[in-house]
C-alpha cells in the first residue's frame, strides 16, 4: 500500500493535542527525508538478523519500525541492509538504535531515522520479535498503522 508523505506539522495541526507524535529526537540518515507507509515492527537488541530477514521481503511502501531498546552500542542497520530494504520497496526505517555507514546511507533513496551512529556490527543470531506493538518516544507503533516522517518528526495515525 502506497501512502503519500504529508508534512507532520500539518498532521499535528489537523489532529490536535491527541496526536501520536514521537518525542525522541531521531536524526535523518537516509537519502529520502520525507516518507510514509504502513508500519511493520521488529524488536531486537544488538542483533540485526531478524530485521534483515524482514527487509528481504517485499516492502510495498511500508515503514519498518525497529525497537533496538535505545542501544547505540552496535549498529542495527548499515549500507548493505539499507540497500536491501530500498531494493525491496520499503519506504523507510525508524530505528530506536544506531546505524553505520552514514555517508553511504545519505545516498540511498530510502528514509532512515535513528538515534545515532556506531561503526560496530551487531550480532546475527536472529533473536527478536516481529509484528508486535513496540513503544518508544511516547508512541506505540502498531503494525498496520501509518507512520509519517519528515524533518520535523514522526506522526503515527491509526489504520482505517
UniProtKB/Swiss-Prot annotation:
<dbReference type="InterPro" id="IPR010203">
    <property type="entry name" value="RraA"/>
</dbReference>
<keyword id="KW-0456">Lyase</keyword>
<comment type="function">
    <text>Catalyzes the aldol cleavage of 4-hydroxy-4-methyl-2-oxoglutarate (HMG) into 2 molecules of pyruvate. Also contains a secondary oxaloacetate (OAA) decarboxylase activity due to the common pyruvate enolate transition state formed following C-C bond cleavage in the retro-aldol and decarboxylation reactions.</text>
</comment>
<protein>
    <recommendedName>
        <fullName>Putative 4-hydroxy-4-methyl-2-oxoglutarate aldolase</fullName>
        <ecNumber>4.1.3.17</ecNumber>
        <ecNumber>4.1.1.112</ecNumber>
    </recommendedName>
</protein>
<keyword id="KW-0479">Metal-binding</keyword>
<dbReference type="GO" id="GO:0008428">
    <property type="term" value="F:ribonuclease inhibitor activity"/>
</dbReference>
<dbReference type="GO" id="GO:0046872">
    <property type="term" value="F:metal ion binding"/>
</dbReference>
<dbReference type="InterPro" id="IPR036704">
    <property type="entry name" value="RraA/RraA-like_sf"/>
</dbReference>
<feature type="binding site">
    <location>
        <begin position="78"/>
        <end position="81"/>
    </location>
    <ligand>
        <name>substrate</name>
    </ligand>
</feature>
<comment type="similarity">
    <text>Belongs to the class II aldolase/RraA-like family.</text>
</comment>
<comment type="subunit">
    <text>Homotrimer.</text>
</comment>
<dbReference type="Pfam" id="PF03737">
    <property type="entry name" value="RraA-like"/>
</dbReference>
<dbReference type="GO" id="GO:0051252">
    <property type="term" value="P:regulation of RNA metabolic process"/>
</dbReference>
<feature type="binding site">
    <location>
        <position position="101"/>
    </location>
    <ligand>
        <name>a divalent metal cation</name>
    </ligand>
</feature>
<dbReference type="GO" id="GO:0047443">
    <property type="term" value="F:4-hydroxy-4-methyl-2-oxoglutarate aldolase activity"/>
</dbReference>
<feature type="binding site">
    <location>
        <position position="100"/>
    </location>
    <ligand>
        <name>substrate</name>
    </ligand>
</feature>
<dbReference type="InterPro" id="IPR005493">
    <property type="entry name" value="RraA/RraA-like"/>
</dbReference>
<dbReference type="GO" id="GO:0008948">
    <property type="term" value="F:oxaloacetate decarboxylase activity"/>
</dbReference>
Amino acid at each position: 500500500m502506497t501512502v503519500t508523505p504529508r508534512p507532520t506539522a500539518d498532521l499535528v495541526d489537523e489532529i490536535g493535542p491527541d496526536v501520536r507524535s514521537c518525542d525522541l529526537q531521531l536524526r535523518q540518515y537516509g537519502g529520502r527525508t520525507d516518507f510514509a507507509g504502513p508500519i511493520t515492527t521488529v524488536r531486537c537488541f544488538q542483533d540485526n538478523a531478524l530485521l534483515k530477514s524482514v527487509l528481504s521481503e517485499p516492502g510495498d511502501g511500508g515503514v519498518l519500525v525497529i525497537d533496538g531498546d535505545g542501544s547505540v552500542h552496535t549498529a542495527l542497520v548499515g549500507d548493505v541492509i539499507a540497500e536491501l530494504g530500498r531494493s525491496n520497496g520499503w519506504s523507510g526505517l525508524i530505528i530506536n538504535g544506531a546505524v553505520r555507514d552514514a555517508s553511504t546511507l545519505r545516498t540511498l533513496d530510502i528514509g532512515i531515522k535513528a538515534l545515532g551512529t556506531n561503526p560496530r556490527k551487531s550480532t546475527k543470531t536472529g533473536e527478536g520479535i516481529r509484528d508486535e506493538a513496540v513503544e518508544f518516544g511516547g508512541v506505540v507503533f502498531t503494525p498496520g498503522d501509518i507512520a509519517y516522517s519528515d524533518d520535523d518528526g514522526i506522526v503515527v495515525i491509526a489504520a482505517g
